[in-house]
């Protein structure tokens, strides 16, 4: 798991070969020009989804992991929390779905990560995470970039 500002994402280009493509896309497009909905960047290797919602989750309601992709959760407006935990703190509630690349769990929160505008959380397959944990009553605008691991 990596917690950083979007302005420092370039620091992590060696982590995944698709990060350089994402940085190039963001430099050419600009965060302020992202519109709601799906974002096609590089086929099934790198794509995103931009959306606005009221964070309504209670920490620990569920956790998720992915096997084929990592997530970059980037808050564009307002703030939200992400609950994170370790494998020994959860039990599986939905077995891994290969088509959707998700496995769901319930369990105990280990930490809350507070994300503000311009900050992002990068989650890897071993990182159990729960997005959309409410901080306040204002809408959150966020983009989640989905990045192929290999």
Predicted feature residues:
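A short beta-loop-beta micro-motif enriched in histidine and acidic residues
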Residues: 43, 59-71, 88-92, 108-109
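An anionic, turn-rich surface loop/hairpin at beta-sheet edges
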Residues: 93-113
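Conserved metal-binding segment of the jelly-roll/cupin
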Residues: 114-132
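A short hydrophobic beta-strand segment most commonly corresponding to one strand
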Residues: 72, 120-122, 137-150
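Glycine- and acidic-residue-biased ligand/ion/polar-headgroup-sensing regions
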Residues: 68-70, 74-84, 88-89, 96-102
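Short histidine-centered beta-strand/loop micro-motifs
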Residues: 58-66, 73, 84-85, 113, ...
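Surface/interface-facing alpha-helical segments and adjacent flexible terminal/loop regions used
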Residues: 1-35, 40-42
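A short glycine-rich, His/Asp/Glu-containing loop-to-beta-strand
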Residues: 38-57, 68-77
């Amino acid at each position: 798991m990596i917690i950083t500002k979007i302005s420092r994402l370039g620091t992590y280009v060696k982590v995944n070969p698709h990060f350089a493509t994402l940085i190039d896309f963001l430099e050419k497009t600009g965060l302020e020009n992202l519109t709601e909905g799906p974002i096609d960047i590089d086929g099934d290797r790198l794509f995103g989804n931009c959306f606005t919602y009221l964070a309504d989750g209670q920490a620990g309601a569920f956790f998720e992991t992915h096997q084929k992709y990592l997530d970059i959760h980037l808050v564009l407006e307002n703030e939200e929390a992400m609950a994170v935990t370790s494998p020994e703190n959860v039990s599986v509630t939905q077995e891994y779905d290969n088509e959707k690349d998700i496995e769901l769990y319930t369990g105990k929160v280990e930490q809350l990560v507070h994300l503000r505008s311009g900050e992002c959380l990068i989650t890897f397959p071993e990182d159990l995470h729960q997005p959309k944990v409410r901080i306040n009553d204002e809408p959150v605008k966020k983009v989640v970039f989905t990045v192929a691991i290999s």
